Amino acid sequence: MHSGKRPLSPESMAGNREEKKELCCCSTLSESDVSDFVSELTGQPIPSSIDDQSSSLTLQEKSNSRQRNYRGVRQRPWGKWAAEIRDPNKAARVWLGTFDTAEEAALAYDKAAFEFRGHKAKLNFPEHIRVNPTQLYPSPATSHDRIIVTPPSPPPPIAPDILLDQYGHFQSRSSDSSANLSMNMLSSSSSSLNHQGLRPNLEDGENVKNISIHKRRK
């Protein structure tokens, strides 16, 4: 007795195999291929994933930062960034130099502007002034802050024993020098007396000898 199901023909069995192969191929497709396939069928683009959106936002932010116009900064044809500022006292432009990035040139302009106008200056990065105004911007030539000069530290105190020893050495040296001085004075005085003729004269001695001989003859 037959169950009522008709046996499949070879053609139908081959068709089922082809359908299974197509399903396997579809399952192995990547998400991007599926999205492209669906967009082609529907005619509407499918929104990209969150990662693609974040990457596109970062690229857009970078392009916006590159296109930002900083005060006192302009780009050279060869790619460098030049910074300059107008001196309010001389009504002339002051050249600040060329820099690799626009941000470095903008910081150089901010520094010069702060030196010229103080807190009234219009800056590219005013938040840097609020964070640390004394370290980043004022230069020593234009800063009005008071300069505190610390006096030199006093020498360490000397112990009384060391003072007494030093005083004793000083006294011994002074006594030796005074003794040497007195000896020199005595030697010089004796030599001067000898030169002045205080020694017995040889001629006087000869005269005395002659007188004594004459008296004996008488």
Curated annotation (Swiss-Prot):
Q: Name one GO biological process term.
A: ethylene-activated signaling pathway
Which segments cross the bilayer? none
Provide the coiled-coil residue spans.
Answer: none
Q: Which UniProt keywords apply?
A: Activator, DNA-binding, Ethylene signaling pathway, Nucleus, Transcription, Transcription regulation
Q: Name one GO molecular function term.
A: DNA-binding transcription factor activity
Alphabetical list of Pfam families matching this protein? AP2
Q: Which GO terms describe its cellular component?
A: nucleus
Q: Which InterPro entries match?
A: AP2/ERF_dom (IPR001471), AP2/ERF_dom_sf (IPR036955), DNA-bd_dom_sf (IPR016177), ERF_plant (IPR044808)
Q: Where in the cell is it found?
A: Nucleus
Q: Where is the composition biased (Low complexity)?
A: 44-56, 174-194
Q: The organism sits in which domain of life?
A: Eukaryota
DNA-binding region(s), chain positions = 69-126
Q: Where is this region: Disordered?
A: 1-20, 41-72, 174-218
The main location is nucleus
The entry's function note states: Probably acts as a transcriptional activator. Binds to the GCC-box pathogenesis-related promoter element. May be involved in the regulation of gene expression by stress factors and by components of stress signal transduction pathways.
Q: Which PANTHER family match?
A: DNA-BINDING DOMAIN, ETHYLENE-RESPONSIVE TRANSCRIPTION FACTOR ERF112
Record family assignment: Belongs to the AP2/ERF transcription factor family. ERF subfamily.
The protein's name is Ethylene-responsive transcription factor ERF112
Source organism per entry reads Arabidopsis thaliana (Mouse-ear cress)
What gene is this protein translated from? Answer: ERF112
